[in-house]
């Protein structure tokens, strides 16, 4: 079954940047999501909000991209009390997934309306199969690095993705 990719929207406030995720956030959207987060991070916003009121579910690739951003903004040894990334209006299923993967500590979670902000339409890319595979591999590796208990969950997935990526690289174009 082909699940449509989530819709991503950028909202900018005075001191914060927000990415609103609508639909099922999966590997197909992960490259665009990572690109958006990287670009927003380069602009040095003091606070980031991921608005999830209309996000029904996230797969492990999307969660891994989110966790990698959380680890980058709140690195080990930093004041995690600051928690510069807020997950707003996440449903119980999403919070449970983040808890089970051992990455919830990287984020502040809350409910409620966003402050006034301006909507920006992101320029989305059309990632190749290789780019999607690489993003998925990196996302799962991050989940295993952050929480070693995830190694048993994702070791076979990462092995398969790494092998698949090597096959793609070795094929002549």
Language-model regions, residue ranges each:
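STAS-typified acidic loop motif
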Residues: 4-35
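Short, flexible active-site loop motifs that bind/organize anionic cofactors or intermediates
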Residues: 20-23, 53, 122
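Amphipathic alpha-helical interaction surfaces in cytosolic regulatory modules
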Residues: 27-107
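Short acidic-hydrophobic, aromatic-tinged amphipathic segments that line or gate anion-handling sites
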Residues: 107-116
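Charged/polar low-complexity intrinsically disordered segments, enriched in acidic residues
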Residues: 116-168
């Amino acid at each position: 079954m082909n699940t449509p990719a989530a819709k991503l929207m950028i909202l900018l406030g005075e001191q914060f940047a927000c990415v609103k995720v609508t639909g099922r956030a999966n590997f197909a959207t992960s490259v665009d999501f990572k690109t958006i987060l990287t670009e927003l991070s380069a602009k040095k916003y003091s606070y980031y909000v991921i608005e999830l009121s209309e996000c029904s579910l996230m797969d492990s690739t999307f969660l891994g991209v989110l966790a990698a951003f959380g680890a980058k903004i709140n690195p080990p040894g930093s004041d995690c009390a600051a928690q510069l990334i807020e997950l707003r209006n996440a449903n119980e299923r999403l919070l449970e997934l983040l808890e089970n993967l051992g990455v919830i500590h990287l984020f502040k979670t809350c409910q409620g309306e966003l402050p006034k902000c301006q909507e920006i339409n992101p320029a989305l890319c059309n990632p190749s199969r290789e780019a999607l595979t690489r993003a998925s591999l990196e996302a799962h590796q991050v989940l295993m690095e952050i929480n070693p208990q995830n190694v048993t969950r994702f070791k076979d997935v990462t092995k398969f993705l790494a092998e698949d990526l090597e096959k793609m690289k070795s094929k002549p174009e």
